[in-house]
Amino acid sequence: VLQWAKTVEGVDLPVVGTVKPWQFTFFIVGFPGLILALFFFLLREPPRHRPTVAPEGGDNLWDMLRHVFANASLYLPFIAIFCYMTIIAYSQGFGAPLFQRTWGWEPAKYATVNAIVLLATGPFAVNFAGWLSDRWTSRGISDAPVRIALIGVAIIIVTGVAAPLVPNPYLAMAIYGANTVGIAFVSAVGVTALLNITPDGIKAQLVAFYYMCISMAGLFIGPPAIGLFNDFVFGTDGIRYSMALVPALFGVPVLLVGPYVLRRYREANAHYESLGQG
């Protein structure tokens, strides 16, 4: 798409009008998502089993927020794990300038190779993480989704630090392929893990809150962190060091609180199981 965009000056679209080639690339990439969204209308509402959030049966936004803050020691470090994933994923928006400044790749070449790597690793890793979570859960490992997420965090840290520092761009891209596996591990189990510790009456609202938190963390921390380190520490040509520092800087604290999150998660899961809820 990027290669094609260089060959035209503008594209005329109904209703929207004339858009620039780089803008039209977003229409092309996003359109398949609209088709996929139609299939969600065919999904049925699953049966509900969990108790409501409050004794009085409250299930509005304020009940959800009260529940979250009343259980902040569970939810906040739990969500932090998945915020880390988006911070790193969004910071990799600097991948094109990283490869251009460090190894001389043009953005179009980076985009093509990166797309191949993502297609080769992402779908398999997401589905494998889901399968592994189900398998471990069926064997009685109640904190299986969080364990898999923390494994993903460890993979992200190691590969995220190593990839920008290697001397060869193809080796770097291969390591970023492994990094994609880590990101997929964390991403795949987030909502599953959350729903296991959430009452019925606020599930949808808490999932929305979860997505809001991880999206804002990714947008407001990931790219700005790279930019700040470039501007004030490593300089424009030192982008590889910024890209290597951010995964470690934000990832190590997440791993350190991992055992605590696992313990609190098991306690919450056991609480719901004690209520006889599946």
What are these regions (language model features)?
Residues G122, I197-F234:
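A late C-terminal transmembrane helix in Major Facilitator Superfamily
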Residues G30-T52, V254-L262:
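C-terminal membrane-cytosol helix-exit motif in multi-pass small-molecule transporters
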Residues F41-D63, N269-G276:
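Flexible cytoplasmic inter-helical loops of multi-pass small-molecule transporters
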